[in-house]
């Protein structure tokens, strides 16, 4: 099986080329790389046009910033290979974890694999207490409605069989994608596995974008997508 690596980015000029190089160098099967620039204003789009466009499977440009969910929607639609994996453009997740992430799919045990930043033995950067508590609360609430036992619903690393992710309509434009896709996967009764990975988190000074407003939106999305008929 081959990989489609989807890289949504917004104002990631400082790290994007390193991420692309890391994805290319990572162990694992043949892959295509699809980058979606979501209306960046820091020169990311110019960087892509000058140094990247034409060297990857696809580079997609959004004229205005719409959010991570919108960027992923564009990327998923463009994917052509059997396994689709999300790679954030900020170096918080290490492409060296690809083999572990996709192995349950290769073994025909899973249709979807979530990573977990809170299980396993890989390095994990120590950061914000309240961010961790909020993540735990959102995962707990999501699990209550989905009847799953995930340890890290809000994680950015997810791998899918292509036919699974392309069959699901993604409605959320921002970080509400995580609880939305979790609810829809649970309703679809897909086989979901979880794998512990390394996590090299950023501070807000280093460019981390998710905030408390996204947390409240996540609660709304948990209710919306689990309770809606």
List each language-model region with its residue ranges.
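Cell-envelope/extracellular polymer assembly enzymes that use nucleotide-activated donors
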Residues: 2-4, 32, 180
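Acidic helix N-cap motif at the loop->helix transition within catalytic regions
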Residues: 14-18, 42-50
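Short, acidic, metal-binding catalytic loop of nucleotide-sugar glycosyltransferases
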Residues: 21-30
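N-proximal low-complexity "stem/linker" segments adjacent to membrane-targeting elements
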Residues: 1-22
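Acceptor/aglycone-binding surface of glycosyltransferases and processive sugar-polymer synthases
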Residues: 64-78, 83, 95-175, 200-212, ...
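A conserved acidic beta->alpha catalytic loop
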Residues: 37-46, 91
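Conserved donor nucleotide-binding strand/loop of the catalytic core
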Residues: 31-34, 45-78
């Amino acid at each position: 099986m081959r990989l489609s690596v989807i890289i949504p980015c917004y104002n990631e000029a400082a790290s994007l080329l390193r991420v692309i190089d890391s994805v290319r160098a990572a162990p694992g099967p043949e892959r295509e790389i699809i980058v979606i620039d979501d209306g960046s204003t820091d020169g990311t789009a110019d960087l892509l046009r000058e140094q990247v466009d034409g060297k990857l499977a696809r580079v997609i440009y959004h004229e205005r910033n719409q959010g991570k969910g919108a960027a992923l929607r564009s990327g998923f639609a463009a994917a052509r290979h059997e396994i689709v994996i999300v790679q954030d453009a900020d170096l918080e997740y290490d492409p060296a974890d690809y083999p572990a992430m996709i192995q349950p799919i290769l073994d025909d045990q899973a249709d979807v694999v979530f990573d977990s930043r809170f299980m396993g033995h890989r390095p994990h950067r120590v950061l914000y207490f309240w961010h961790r508590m909020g993540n735990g609360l959102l995962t707990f609430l999501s699990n209550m409605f989905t009847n799953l036992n995930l340890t890290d619903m809000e994680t950015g690393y997810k791998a899918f069989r292509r036919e699974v992710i392309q069959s699901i309509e993604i409605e959320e434009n921002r970080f509400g994608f995580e609880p939305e896709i979790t609810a829809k996967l649970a309703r679809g009764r897909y086989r979901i596995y979880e794998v512990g990975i390394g996590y090299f988190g950023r501070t807000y000074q280093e460019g981390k974008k998710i905030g408390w407003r996204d947390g409240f939106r996540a609660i709304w999305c948990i209710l919306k997508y689990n309770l809606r008929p």
